Regions:
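N-terminal signal peptide c-region/cleavage motif recognized by signal peptidases
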Residues: 18-20
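Short sequence/structural segments immediately N-terminal
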Residues: 28-30, 79
Length: 108
């Protein structure tokens, strides 16, 4: 009985996570992020899985990435982007949405 309950709970959690990931991707699309990024592959900017891997375990990464998305910049991914800058997304994208997007990327 416990194993069955655990399996049901795990399946429900997976559905919630995939639903959240879908909502996060929709927010990324609406915000214009997918013009330069994708989860798996470099487009203009780095793949988000590569960003997550680079900053894994870095306690200050979230705040730095939020600032990078807000203000834009260049230099961190020059080898990948060929020097193409990250454009600023604030105030066009709300601060709370930028934070959600950064959480999504770092959680990959």
């Amino acid at each position: 009985m416990k194993a069955k309950l655990f399996a049901i709970s795990a399946a429900a959690a997976a559905l919630l996570i995939s639903g959240q990931a879908s909502a996060d991707l929709e927010l990324a699309k609406k915000s214009g992020c997918l013009a330069c990024h994708s989860v798996e592959k470099k487009v203009v900017g780095p793949a988000w899985k590569d960003v997550a891997a680079k900053y894994k375990g870095d306690a200050g990464a979230k705040e730095r990435l939020i600032e990078k998305v807000k203000k834009g910049g260049k230099g961190n991914w020059t080898a990948v982007t060929g020097g193409a800058p990250m454009p600023p997304y604030s105030p066009r994208v709300k601060d709370e949405d930028i934070a959600k997007l950064v959480d999504f990327v770092l959680g990959l």
